[in-house]
Amino acid sequence: MNGVIKKIISRLRDIRSEEEKILEFISSLRLSSTQALLDIGCGYGNKLKPIQALGINAVGVDANAVLIQRNREAGLSCMTSEEFKQTDDTYDVLLMSHIIEHFMPERLLEFMDSYLDRLKLGGHLIIATPLNSPYFYDDFDHIKPYHPVGIDMVFGGSELQVQYYARNCIQLQDLWFRREPLKLTFFAGLYVKKHSRLPKLINLLLALLFRLSFGVIGKTNGWIGLYKKVAK
């Protein structure tokens, strides 16, 4: 019963998936066959597969050498972080999907700058990341949620007084906020089977309201930003 409820809620919540929006942003750039996209932190290649299916010259990079080997065996173009450092290739598009929330500010600054150094002037960066929520830290290695305003303060060439200044400059071109159903969170019945299933049934109702209202009755829990690299 619990598994059935979870599946129904999962189907009801996806009015428009994040993956679809990422592909829409990439498609809007109308990349030619000579242009290249780098998927940073590509993991299992879940983003690489549909991107390459669009006919785009896409390469993945990840710190996990085991995953990179599996991706290669599956026919995906990938390299490890160490292999990437040995190259001097530049790219037209960078994709950072669910990456930045795993870094503290100082480390994120250097991480992003190291990749933005390899983004061509006029090229684009796509960031997909969650916002703060009661379940942000369900992911054990989530460190900090980041807002578009915060990214702009450090990477947008802002003259505001901040602790960090990036050596690269990016400007926000487009923005999409991900939404999901309202839901109960801190109830024992959501975690332990022996407790009442009422919270799960209430969450099912809230997911249905989210769907019927086309996402109006819900909350924002993440965002995708399309940025362009510009001269400082």
Predicted regions and their residues:
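Pocket-edge positions in alpha/beta enzyme catalytic cores
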Residues: S10-D14, I100, I143
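S-adenosyl-L-methionine-dependent methyltransferase catalytic module, highlighting the catalytic core
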Residues: N46, A63, V93-M96, F103-K120, ...
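Conserved N-terminal segment of class I S-adenosyl-L-methionine
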Residues: M1-D89, V93-L95, R107-D113, G218-Y227, ...
